[in-house]
Amino acid sequence: MPLQGRTALVTGVSREQGIGFAIARRLLADGTRVFAHGWTPHDDEMPWGADRGGTAAVTAALGGEGDRLAYAHADLAEADAPAALLAAAGERYGMVDTLVVNHARSSTYDLDGLTAAELDLCWAVNVRATLLLVQAYAAQYDAAAGKERGGGRVVLFTSGQHLAPMSQEIPYAATKGALQQLTLTLSDALVDRGITVNCVNPGPTDTGWATDELAAEVGRALPRGTWNTPDEAAAVVALLLGDDAATITGNTVNAESGFRRWVY
């Protein structure tokens, strides 16, 4: 178990087909204690919808809550939610040495359709909450003398906005792109405290949201002919959390399977 004994807060664990679920499952299999977070009202608003069984089914599929798995429902649009989430994780399992920020607010607004309210909400969930999570994580890591133990890890997520335009999803593109840009800055802020910060761009990933037409169209731009899987994204995260990745910080890992955007 390569990640035996670690304690991770993983955000965005709300659907069994999602990347967050795959990350939580992988970390549990690798020996990590996982405090998982989700917010199903956002899924309810989206075309894919929330899982029928809700978060109870999600936690059951991960083995059920107990000594190594806990779950919290929190709206990260609320300014005090990130710190409260870290506090709850610490109260349950002690020092959190691993933070995986996987949650996101999706937003399909082009330039003509976007609104100030949607821009503010995407900023609050995707950027502000991420920064406040990292801030709270670093504070509790320092308070628990985490640097002396070594191995602090933060992993953020982006979606390739630094590689190509996304003009039909401007609020989402702006805020997820910001996380990719913040990775280097946060890595510099935390490297002296014994914490690495990296970002994962998982490429087109089959989480059940794409139509058959879109899946086929994008699939033609992927050398394998098929989209990446959530388990493959989780494997990249596990790699960045391991001891062998101790010297890797400030990087964005483009795990896109050779995605040829010019074909798509």
Where is each model-derived feature located?
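Short-chain dehydrogenase/reductase
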Residues: 1-93, 106-109
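Catalytic loop of short-chain dehydrogenase/reductase
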Residues: 12, 146-178, 183-192, 204
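Conserved mid-core segment of classical short-chain dehydrogenase/reductases
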Residues: 48-54, 83, 104-120, 139, ...
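Catalytic Tyr-X3-Lys loop
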Residues: 105, 112-134, 155, 179, ...
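Alpha-helical segment proximal to the catalytic Tyr-Lys
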Residues: 139, 188-189, 246
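Short C-terminal tail/terminal secondary-structure segment
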Residues: 164, 216, 220, 224, ...
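Short, small/polar-rich loop/turn modules that mediate ligand/substrate recognition or access, typified
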Residues: 191, 196, 248-250
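A conserved structural motif in NAD(P)-dependent oxidoreductases
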Residues: 222-233
